[in-house]
Amino acid sequence: MTFKAEYIWIDGTEPTAKLRSKTKIITGQPAGLDALPIWGFDGSSTNQAEGHSSDCVLKPVFTCPDPIRGGDDILVLCEVLNIDLTPHASNTRAALAEVAERFAAQEPIFGIEQEYTFFQDGYPLGFPKGGFPAPQGGYYCGVGADEIFGRDVVEAHLDNCLKAGLAISGINAEVMPGQWEFQVGPVSPLEVSDHLWVARWLLYRTAEDFDVAATLDPKPVKGDWNGAGAHTNFSTKAMRESYDAIITAAESLGEGSKPLDHVKNYGAGIDDRLTGLHETAPWNEYSYGVSDRGASVRIPWQVEKDGKGYIEDRRPNANVDPYVVTRLLVDTCCSALEKAGQV
């Protein structure tokens, strides 16, 4: 027998990488990740190589059922390697794997809230051509054809993620018309990142069938309209047991150069979204607070009440690389917790 394997990878486009994929026909029974062959592609067409030395290598790192094709067909997320099998410069997963392994004993886990916006014919869904809809207010978690746009795509995407076995944990309509969110986690750093990249691919691929485009642009409409983020919820074993560890983690993100070190890697266009308006903190200031959606980092009220839990970094853009944001949070917070003896 044969089956189709859709090899998916992250390209070298700057400042925001794109997803690419192509299909390999494999003979035999599906036998898991380790049985999948490495493959290759033309890196000169993906901003990952020069034409005179264009070969790049695809190494499978995660696989799941293909919910669109069905049957025995699979999706295969890959790392990009050089031909000497070292990580390619665009491969951010390899660096996360090292940091995640170093701090594995602290048991870090993540939940990421992926916001995105639907466009059709150059306009956000729900925006009249050449004009604007009613101001924000009734769209968030709304219901009804006058306030909700694209639900058929959202439901199809949710079903596809569930069929694929991804760790998707919810969906909701967002503040701007045509803007939605899905959540992945809580799971380990590598798992949340792998699953989010595949969920993004499924979002684009599902929307294709509806002749709709999905964008992770952090500020898709200028003016008094919310941007799109990827709020990143994070905890360690100590944070899930102690409020002191929560404070240590929140404080560590504001120390020295850490605020800028993080923000400059939280997605292109961060200054367009983090203005201090529309439930954001200014990009060049750091703050944290309980139940404060205008802070850089929010401590949920339930966490303060329970004396344990997690923090929400509200700064990452919708277009952030999850391998990068999880690596930075694990490195900064786990280092501080280790130094404080809160492990």
UniProtKB/Swiss-Prot annotation:
It is found in: Cytoplasm. Belongs to the glutamine synthetase family. Residues 92-343 form the GS catalytic domain. PANTHER family: GLUTAMINE SYNTHETASE, GLUTAMINE SYNTHETASE 2 CYTOPLASMIC. It comes from Streptomyces viridochromogenes. One of its GO terms (molecular function) is metal ion binding. Keywords: ATP-binding, Cytoplasm, Ligase, Magnesium, Metal-binding, Nucleotide-binding. This is Glutamine synthetase. The keyword Ligase applies. Its main location: cytoplasm. Homooctamer and homotetramer. L-glutamate binds at residue 279.
